[in-house]
């Protein structure tokens, strides 16, 4: 009986992990679409057309404490300085997907 439960648990674990990875990949795909449609005009390639020193590059995000999903999500929802707020224009899921995409791209060096 223990062996059957162990096998069942192992199969179930692989199933859950597989779907979690698919969902995460889909989030990055959506994040890229949201970023391209709403952010790329000012932030193409992780740059910043308005404030060139405030890029989305990994070292700059870290230096400005913007290297977490929560920090990026908050900034996108509420805006700051020249950056408009997108909280009323985009749903929370799209903003979080875009934040995940930004962090992923910053890790890859854009």
UniProtKB/Swiss-Prot annotation:
A GO biological process held by the record: photosynthesis
Gene label: petJ
PTM section of the record: Binds 1 heme c group covalently per subunit.
UniProt signal peptide: 1-25
Alphabetical UniProt keywords: Chloroplast, Electron transport, Heme, Iron, Metal-binding, Photosynthesis, Plastid, Signal, Thylakoid, Transport
Primary role: Functions as an electron carrier between membrane-bound cytochrome b6-f and photosystem I in oxygenic photosynthesis.
Chief place of localization: plastid
Superkingdom of origin: Eukaryota
Species: Pyropia yezoensis
Localization per record: Plastid, Chloroplast thylakoid lumen
Residues that bind heme c: 39, 42-43, 83
GO molecular function ontology, one term from the record: electron transfer activity
Subunit structure: Monomer.
Disulfide bonds: none
InterPro entries found in the cross-reference section: Cyt_c-like_dom, Cyt_c-like_dom_sf, Cyt_C6, Cyt_C_IC
GO CC aspect terms: chloroplast thylakoid lumen
Family of the protein in this entry: Belongs to the cytochrome c family. PetJ subfamily.
Protein name per Swiss-Prot or TrEMBL: Cytochrome c6
Lineage: Eukaryota, Rhodophyta, Bangiophyceae, Bangiales, Bangiaceae
SUPFAM superfamilies per record: Cytochrome c
């Amino acid at each position: 009986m223990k062996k059957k439960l162990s096998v069942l648990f192992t199969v179930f674990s692989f199933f859950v992990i597989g779907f979690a990875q698919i969902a995460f990949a889909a989030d990055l795909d959506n994040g890229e679409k949201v970023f391209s449609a709403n952010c790329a005009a000012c932030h193409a390639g992780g740059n910043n057309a308005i404030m060139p020193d405030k890029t989305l590059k990994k070292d700059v995000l870290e230096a400005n404490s913007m290297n977490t999903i929560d920090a990026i999500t908050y900034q996108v929802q509420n805006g700051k300085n020249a950056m408009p707020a997108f909280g009323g224009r985009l749903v929370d899921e799209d903003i979080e997907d875009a934040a995940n995409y930004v962090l992923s791209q910053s890790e890859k060096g854009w």
